[in-house]
């Protein structure tokens, strides 16, 4: 059977960055891997960031769009059926940051997928710089995406102050208690290390971490209404201008609660990727891109954000 690993995590936690490293480890171990990318919105930016991994032993499939639950399940099921025919021995799925994890388990239990796939590891990426105060909906998603994880992998630990990562795990455990889940994470359930220092032994630990059977009380809300994804194509702005716009959007409440700004910008000699959260903005070169900026958050003012992005 093909082993499926799921990498979960709230918006902007660093799932794609970790997935890249994890898949490189799996390929080095001799596995043939297919990545299934499911981004929040109509343009799959994260899949573009992984294109250089494609080769003899690695390929990428995508599901894009904030569609309804039934349509999303149907698309994922169809992708998994087609992937099963292609001879991969490992599949790694990176869902969007507002993914209902139960959807995934339901799909794997369906015929004929239950005969072709086995669930390997559920890996939850949690930002060591996570905001202290989140909305009830965001806290629920944080908890539900980690509840069945075999391991929590902390991101951006090198930027965290002493005690900050531990406080985030306390936050996660409070969020789990808030949805009446018995699961709690302690030191043995968490990998807290600068990702630049991760070893083969660390990735082997991730590979064998498995998953946990758990339950929690669902918070019923429409994730795609609570969390909005706005797309701005061909804004015609420089890297410096987009960086300044992202900084403004993330720190001025008049635009709504902006959680993340990401996208690609032409810089004259090629393309750069911008990835911005409230406490950090990174800009780095990439081989290719599409001129698009995506703003994700809660209660967003589209008109005001478009003015800030386009500078008009």
Identify the meaning behind each predicted range.
Residues 51-55, 145, 181-185:
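Short, conserved catalytic or adaptor-binding loops enriched in Gly and charged residues
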Residues 111-117, 142-143, 169-178:
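A short alpha->loop->secondary-structure connector
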Residues 3, 72, 100, 145, ...:
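Helical mechanochemical/support elements of P-loop NTPase systems and associated helical scaffolds
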Residues 140-141, 148:
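Short, glycine-/small-residue-rich phosphate/pyrophosphate-handling segment
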Residues 121, 150-151:
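Well-ordered beta-strand positions
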């Amino acid at each position: 059977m093909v082993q499926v690993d799921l990498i979960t995590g709230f918006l902007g936690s660093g799932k794609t960055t970790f997935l890249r490293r994890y898949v490189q480890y799996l390929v080095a171990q001799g596995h043939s891997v297919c990545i299934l990318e499911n981004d929040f919105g109509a343009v799959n930016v994260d899949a573009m960031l992984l294109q250089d991994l494609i080769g003899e032993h690695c390929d990428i499939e995508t599901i894009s769009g904030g569609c309804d639950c039934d349509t999303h399940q149907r698309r994922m099921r169809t992708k998994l059926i087609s992937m099963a025919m292609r001879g991969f021995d490992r599949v790694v799925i990176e869902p969007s940051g507002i993914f209902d994890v139960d959807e995934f388990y339901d799909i794997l239990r369906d015929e004929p997928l239950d005969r072709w796939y086995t669930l390997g590891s559920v890996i939850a990426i949690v930002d060591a710089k996570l905001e202290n105060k989140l909305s009830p909906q965001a806290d629920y998603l944080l908890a539900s995406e980690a509840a069945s994880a075999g391991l929590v992998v902390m991101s951006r630990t090198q930027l965290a102050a002493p005690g900050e990562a531990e406080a985030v795990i306390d936050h996660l455990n409070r969020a789990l208690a808030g949805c009446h889940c018995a699961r709690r994470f302690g030191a043995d359930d968490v990998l807290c290390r600068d990702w630049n220092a991760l070893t083969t032994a660390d990735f082997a630990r991730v590979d064998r971490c498995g998953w946990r059977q758990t339950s929690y009380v669902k918070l019923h809300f429409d994730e795609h209404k609570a969390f909005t994804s706005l797309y701005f194509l061909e804004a015609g702005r420089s890297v410096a201008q987009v960086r300044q716009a992202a900084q403004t959007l993330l720190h001025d409440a008049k635009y709504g609660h902006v959680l993340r700004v990401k996208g690609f910008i032409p810089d004259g000699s090629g393309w750069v990727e911008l990835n911005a959260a409230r406490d950090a903005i990174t800009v780095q070169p990439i081989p290719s891109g599409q001129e698009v900026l995506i703003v994700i958050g809660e209660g967003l003012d589209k008109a005001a954000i478009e003015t800030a992005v386009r500078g008009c």
